[in-house]
Design a protein with these regions (language model features):
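Generic leucine side-chain signal with a strong bias for well-ordered alpha-helical environments
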Residues: 23-24, 81, 100, 107, ...
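Long, low-complexity serine/threonine/glycine- and acidic-rich segments characteristic of extracellular
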Residues: 38-129
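Boundary at the C-terminal end of the N-terminal hydrophobic targeting segment
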Residues: 34-36
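Bacterial signal peptide processing site
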Residues: 30-32
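Bacterial N-terminal signal peptides
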Residues: 17-28
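N-terminal pro-sequences and low-complexity stem/linker regions of secreted or lumenal proteins
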Residues: 129-523
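N-terminal secretory signal peptides that target proteins for export/translocation
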Residues: 1-13
């Protein structure tokens, strides 16, 4: 499978938003090997659908590969399902996935070339029941302010040491950049499990990117008497600090192309997490009386009759800033209920959000102890793995944004959620909502997870919403989640690989937490 918008050429993607007759999800990606894998007809012009075959019985989602033969330049490829256009790409071949309801469907791939010739191929497929229906519960838990390189920059070595010599875009240890004093600093292993804050603000984040050079994280770091040169931006952790997370990600599914939604701090990203847009906001702006009125994923679930619950751990309840809270506060309950609810699968809601524990310092945010935070995550997930609900659940663990910590991969291009421009002030750096934020850690945990899996497809936080929408037939919120990958690549529904969860290590909480140890060696 190819990576979305990650194959060295730009593509234009269009997809259907709600309403549509069928539940359809397209992963917009172009494979550089699609044509080679798909022998073309000698007819000029023609479209050849190589996968699936005509008359095939297919799972949902199903893999679709098609190519063209044309003496003129093919400008556009489109997919129609039962006469409804669901996908469009400016390319001469495609390699993507389509989710559909159970039953027989007419699938057409249509091309248009430079002289406006239109030609196509149509096949019939039958989608089987099952697939995503094996997931009766989707749980998402989003911690705070960690970049991919800060937590999982050494995951490639961890995998190689266990016999997996696959590609994993890991932290380049030999890179170096100037700090505020002009000294070159390379990534270094933190000697402390806590450190001072940096800044993931709109301006700092856009400054850090520097046209894709990714070399200004230290320069934008918040002032500190301990680390005045900002070197802590280059610090990282590994399996000796976070053995539970490393093994969890190794055994189940992870990604080296999962991003936050916007180059901005926590609140705009959590707006995307709930509403698939920040409706122009780039700062932690105060909501109006009664909360933000824009619809959230929870409102969409209500309208679709899909049960949900929101578990909070201390007095941190971000949903209280939304009008959804006024209508649905009864669905927001203390985390103690989680440990009993999961042992009654019949009444466990279909969608669950677990709030991070900010007030008690267990959210893994800079300033806080990463080991006590990750140990708390283990407690929550252990309970699920040992419950009756494990067999039918998927648990998605990620972080809201990178926190100003170094990551070497530039943000990716994504669709704008809507027509609302960023609310820029006169001194703000230019930017828009057509790119992601920085990479963040992701682990997808389920008995249906592909074992030892690494995804290289570009996704961001709204892909979690898309997974929920696709699974429970819920309309999308904006164009951003409507065009997001649905994360089904992480699962193998032919068999549950982890009926019994794999053995996982304890997460120690005895590491040294001392801000005085946060600086780079030699500083």
């Amino acid at each position: 499978m190819c990576s979305f918008l990650n194959v060295g050429k730009k593509v234009t993607v269009w997809r259907v938003s709600w309403p549509v007759i069928l539940l359809l999800t397209i992963t917009a990606c172009v494979s550089t090997s699609a044509a080679a894998l798909c022998p073309q007809s000698s007819v000029d012009p023609s479209v050849t659908i190589c996968t699936p075959k005509d008359g095939a019985i297919v799972p949902s989602p199903t893999h679709v590969v098609a190519g063209t033969n044309d003496s003129h330049t093919v400008k556009l490829l489109q997919i129609y399902l039962d006469g409804v256009k669901v996908y469009e790409i400016a390319a001469s071949s495609l390699d993507t996935t389509v989710s559909m309801s159970a039953g027989k469907h007419r699938l057409t791939v249509q091309a248009k070339d430079s002289i406006s010739q239109i030609f196509k191929q149509t096949i019939y497929v039958t989608a089987t029941a099952g697939g995503l229906s094996n997931l009766k519960h989707i749980i998402f838990f989003v911690q705070e302010n960690r970049s991919q390189d800060n937590y999982f920059g050494r995951m490639g070595k961890y995998r190689r040491d266990r016999g997996f010599n696959d590609s994993f875009d890991e932290l380049p240890l030999n890179g170096s950049f100037p700090d505020k004093a002009g000294h070159l600093v390379s990534p270094y292993h933190f000697k402390t499990v806590c450190h001072e804050n940096l800044t993931p603000s709109w301006n700092a984040s856009h400054y850090d990117v520097h046209g894709g050079k990714m070399d200004r994280f230290m320069l934008s770091a918040l002032a500190s008497t301990i680390d005045p040169d900002g070197t802590r931006a280059m610090g990282y952790y590994d399996w000796t600090d976070l053995p539970y997370y490393y093994e969890l990600a190794f055994q189940f599914g992870t990604s080296d192309r999962f991003f936050s939604s916007v180059l901005a701090p926590t609140i705009p990203n959590r707006m995307y997490l709930f509403a698939a847009t920040s409706f122009g906001h780039i700062r932690p702006d105060k909501p109006p009386e009664g909360g933000w009125p824009q619809p959230t994923i929870f409102d969409k679930l209500d309208n679709a009759g899909v049960s949900w619950k929101y578990y909070y751990q201390d007095n941190s309840i971000y949903l209280a800033e939304w009008s959804t809270w006024q209508r649905d506060s009864g669905k927001v309950v203390k985390i103690a209920n989680w440990y009993t609810d999961i042992n009654n699968e019949d009444t466990l809601p279909k969608v669950i959000f677990i709030e991070r524990a900010t007030a008690t310092g267990l959210d893994e945010h800079p300033l806080n102890n990463i080991q006590t935070g990750s140990a708390n995550t283990k407690k929550i997930l252990d309970a699920l793995m040992n419950s009756i609900s494990w067999d039918s659940s998927a648990f998605v663990l990620t972080f809201d944004e990178g926190g100003g910590l170094y990551d070497h991969v530039p943000p990716a291009t994504v669709p704008k959620p809507d027509s609302i421009a960023p609310m820029l002030r006169s001194d703000d750096l230019a930017g828009d909502f057509n790119e992601t934020g920085f990479r963040i850690p992701l682990i997808v945990v389920s008995p249906w997870s592909k074992p030892n899996f690494v995804s290289h497809r570009v996704r961001e936080l709204t892909s979690i919403l898309r997974l929920i929408e696709v699974r429970f037939n819920v309309p999308n919120l904006t164009d951003r989640d409507g065009m997001a990958d649905d994360m089904t690549e992480f699962f193998d529904f032919s068999t549950p690989h982890w009926v019994t969860p794999p053995p996982l290590p304890d997460q120690p909480t005895t590491g040294t937490c001392d801000f005085n140890l946060e600086k780079a060696p030699g500083h």
